[in-house]
């Protein structure tokens, strides 16, 4: 397994491409923005995207979901408690794309020849989850405290 981190969007949210190096299949975690950046990486490395997994439904983690799902034909996974989450000041709502799937605490999702264990980690959002794949833990914003907003530096 190999992991490529792509900082995307104004908040430079980490989008992860988790790669099965034996099959060149991958899973995209939290495609928050810049679908072109994500797709360029997938295509330039001859990867076959098998799924999109979301740690929660905030705009900076789901902004490119529909574009990446449309271009790859991949199912999108999210915890049901975040499916209709308000994601922006404009009131824009995240809607699970057709063919989307729900996961919850304790589920094990086999995708791209890898297994992703789902751990419910509510708090940042009601449906927040963390994902374990082999020796990697993907937490989204679970460990983030918002007593202040930390923005990326230039």
Where are these regions (language model features)?
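Conserved beta-strand hairpin/beta-sheet module of binuclear metal-dependent hydrolase folds
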Residues: 1-45, 130-140
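Ser/Thr-glycine-rich phosphate-binding loops at phosphate-binding pockets of nucleotides
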Residues: 53-56, 121, 125, 139, ...
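Conserved catalytic scaffold of divalent metal-dependent phosphoesterases
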Residues: 81-83, 107, 114, 124-125, ...
């Amino acid at each position: 397994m190999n992991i490529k981190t792509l900082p995307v969007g104004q908040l430079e949210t980490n989008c992860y491409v988790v790669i099965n190096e034996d099959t060149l299949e991958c899973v995209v975690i939290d495609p928050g923005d810049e679908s072109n950046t994500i797709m360029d990486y997938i295509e330039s490395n001859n990867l076959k995207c098998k799924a999109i997994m979301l740690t929660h439904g905030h705009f900076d983690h789901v902004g490119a979901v529909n574009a990446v799902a449309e271009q790859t034909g991949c199912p999108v996974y999210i915890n049901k408690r975040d499916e209709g989450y308000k994601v922006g000041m404009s009131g824009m709502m995240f809607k699970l794309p057709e063919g989307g799937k729900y996961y919850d605490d304790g589920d094990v999702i086999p995708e791209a020849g890898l297994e992703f264990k789902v751990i419910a980690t509510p708090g940042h959002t009601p449906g927040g989850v963390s994902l374990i794949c082999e020796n990697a833990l993907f937490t989204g914003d679970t460990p983030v405290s918002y007593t202040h907003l930390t923005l990326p530096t230039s």
